[in-house]
Swiss-Prot record:
The lineage of its organism: Bacteria, Pseudomonadati, Pseudomonadota, Gammaproteobacteria, Alteromonadales. This is Isocitrate dehydrogenase kinase/phosphatase. GO terms for molecular function: [isocitrate dehydrogenase (NADP+)] kinase activity; AMP binding; ATP binding; phosphoprotein phosphatase activity; protein serine/threonine kinase activity. Its EC number is 2.7.11.5, 3.1.3.-. ATP binds at residues 315-321, 336. It is found in: Cytoplasm. Keywords: ATP-binding, Cytoplasm, Glyoxylate bypass, Hydrolase, Kinase, Nucleotide-binding, Protein phosphatase, Serine/threonine-protein kinase, Transferase, Tricarboxylic acid cycle. The keyword NAD does not apply. The active site is at 371. Bifunctional enzyme which can phosphorylate or dephosphorylate isocitrate dehydrogenase (IDH) on a specific serine residue. This is a regulatory mechanism which enables bacteria to bypass the Krebs cycle via the glyoxylate shunt in response to the source of carbon. When bacteria are grown on glucose, IDH is fully active and unphosphorylated, but when grown on acetate or ethanol, the activity of IDH declines drastically concomitant with its phosphorylation. GO terms for cellular component: cytoplasm. One of its GO terms (biological process) is glyoxylate cycle. Belongs to the AceK family.
Length: 564
């Protein structure tokens, strides 16, 4: 039976609507999980939301296959793409629906057809009628209600749903911090507007209120974290201003927020205004639309290639035994491809590496593990690949590449934000920077432990330093759940030592991970418990009991004083 472009386009769009409804249901549950302090459910929902996209793409792709087969009818699909484009003109999630169409098409057909004739390599939404940013926020005018009255209205409207521990104290502290910031920026409370996004941003054990202060000549971002105590009472924890601090909270090493929105593009435009250095890819990912983040990243990369002429080359640092890593010097990312033969004594294979990278993707990254984007069949112009890198490809990842004319296709790769490897950073750092970096390295280990992550290979080369001087882990091939490991104290006599595959002896960790004594001593001065097996076992025990340690994405000195 012949199918019309109209029917085919609507069938794919129906698949997208099913996905988005499920996405919204999982997101809407964030408030109840927060109020119930059901942190286990928080983790499960975050993982399910990431997984569900691929499930719905697969379901829709099978329906398409049943109707049209896997042999491409060029006329039908050219017309289907055109009709689908028309359906999106007034669609509130148009950019996400474009990406969903691409995912379905690419699941069904050969990569030879992955071009702008059949899919949306480039967006066609330039003429799309965007949902106004104002659709996503409420505006308040302190000249009418006064600052305290305005702040009270913000909390009433946003609907957190719980009772506050000491609401009057929270409002007073917010007011004081607001006036402190107003003095710094020379603004007056009666001469401004406050815009607040309608829905709270939920992540881990906190809800965040996000907004901006708009004056005649400027605007200023702010974010208000709200926590919940052991009795289920809410309290405001801080009033955070400055774009760089907000960027850290929305950082690439953190889990995705859950925030309700009918118009993601409007939400992202609001956030982009507050954090102009963030890319669209980063912002879409940060609010849970990670597939849209991939789409935006790929478009950014293609545009960057057209504007530049530098060559892809090996990434700086010690070469790993599992991944071939390369970069484009003018583009702030690294590309990682699993080697054909894993080096050293690695007792696992390719699929284990893939599974572990995906595990981290779904897990709470607590600001200490870089997000990854996974791509298949990525086409790169051969002329942009240096001769040395091409030779390295042929020697290490020959099974993962193919050359088609003037294009090199990588069949699977992972992308991460480029950072300065910690071992290289330390070589050029001054004493103060070394102290801070080794302290933060220890904090990173502890925070990953608290999130039930054992990094496995803790060598300094597997950690990077961000532009905010934060230490972040990025090498996941040996990652395990902390609760799967057995932490033991070393026997006094060597002959008494016996090893099982999951055994770890913390007394040896510092020496193995940080062989240079000058760095190791600084680490152990700040974090001596890292070589105490009892400490690791205590953390393990707490995790098994469902007790999650608080890890705040902002400095402790920004936190409010609680008054009961």
């Amino acid at each position: 039976m012949t199918i019309s472009p109209e029917t085919l386009a609507k069938s794919i769009l129906d698949g997208f609507h099913s996905h988005y409804r499920r996405f919204q249901v999982l997101t809407q549950g964030a408030r109840e999980r927060f109020l119930k302090r059901d942190w286990t459910a928080v983790v499960s929902a975050a993982s399910e939301r990431i997984h569900y996209y691929d499930h719905q793409v697969g379901t829709t792709a099978k329906k398409v296959e049943r109707r049209v087969g896997t042999e491409l009818d060029e006329g039908l699909w050219l017309a289907t793409r055109q009709r689908y484009q028309q359906l999106l003109k007034f669609h509130p999630q148009a950019e996400l629906a474009e990406t969903f169409y691409n995912s379905v098409f690419c699941r069904v057909f050969d990569r030879a057809y992955f071009n702008n004739d059949y899919i949306f390599v480039e967006t066609v939404l330039a003429n799309h009628i965007p949902v106004p940013v104002e659709n996503e926020c409420h505006s308040y005018f302190p000249v009418v209600d006064g600052l305290e009255g305005t702040l009270t209205r913000v909390f009433e409207d946003i609907g957190l749903g719980g009772e506050f521990e000491n609401f009057e104290n929270d409002i007073e502290q917010l007011r004081d911090k607001f006036f402190e910031r107003a003095t710094e920026t020379d603004i007056e409370a009666h001469n401004l507007r406050i815009d607040v996004l309608k829905s709270p941003f939920y992540r881990n054990k906190a809800a965040y209120i996000v907004g901006r202060v708009v004056t005649e000549n400027n605007h200023y971002p702010f974010i208000v974290p709200v926590l919940i105590n052991s009795q289920g009472k809410l309290y405001v924890d801080a009033f955070i201003t400055r774009s760089d601090r907000m960027a850290t909270i929305f950082g690439f090493a953190r889990s995705y927020f859950m925030v309700e929105t009918e118009a993601p593009s409007a939400l992202v435009r609001f956030l982009k205004d507050l954090m102009p250095h963030k890319t669209l890819a980063e912002l879409y990912s940060s609010v849970g639309f990670h597939k849209q983040g991939k789409t935006e990243f790929y478009r950014e990369f293609l545009h960057h290639l057209r504007r530049t002429d530098d060559q892809l080359s090996a990434a700086p640092g010690v070469k790993g035994m599992v991944m071939t890593v390369f970069t484009l010097p003018s583009f702030p990312y690294v590309f990682k491809v699993i080697k054909d033969r894993l080096g050293g004594t690695k007792e696992f294979g390719r699929q284990t590496v893939i599974d572990r990278y995906r595990m981290v993707k779904r897990h709470d990254r607590v600001g200490r593990m870089a997000d990854t984007l996974e791509f298949v069949d990525v086409a790169l112009p051969l002329k942009r690949i240096s001769a040395d890198l091409l030779d390295e490809f042929k020697q290490t990842i020959a099974n993962s590449i193919s050359i088609e004319g003037d294009t090199l296709v990588i069949h699977q790769l992972f992308v991460e934000r480029r950072m300065t490897p910690l071992n290289l950073y330390l070589e050029y750092a001054n004493d103060e920077e070394v102290d801070a970096a080794m302290d933060d390295y220890g904090r990173a280990l502890k925070e990953m432990m608290a999130a039930n992550i054992f990094p496995g290979d803790m060598l300094l080369k597997n950690f990077g330093v961000t532009r905010h001087k934060r230490v972040v882990f990025y090498d996941y091939d040996e990652v395990r759940y902390l609760t799967d490991m057995s932490f033991r104290r070393l026997p006094e006599n060597d002959w008494e030592v016996s090893y099982a595959p999951d055994d770890v002896f913390p007394q040896q960790l510092a020496q193995f991970a940080v062989p240079q004594a000058k760095y190791r001593n600084k680490l152990l001065k700040r974090h001596p418990e890292l070589i105490d097996s009892a400490y690791w076992c205590r953390v393990q025990k707490n995790i098994r009991k469902g007790e999650l340690t608080d890890v705040f994405p902002y400095d402790a000195d920004l936190r409010f004083t609680r008054r009961f």
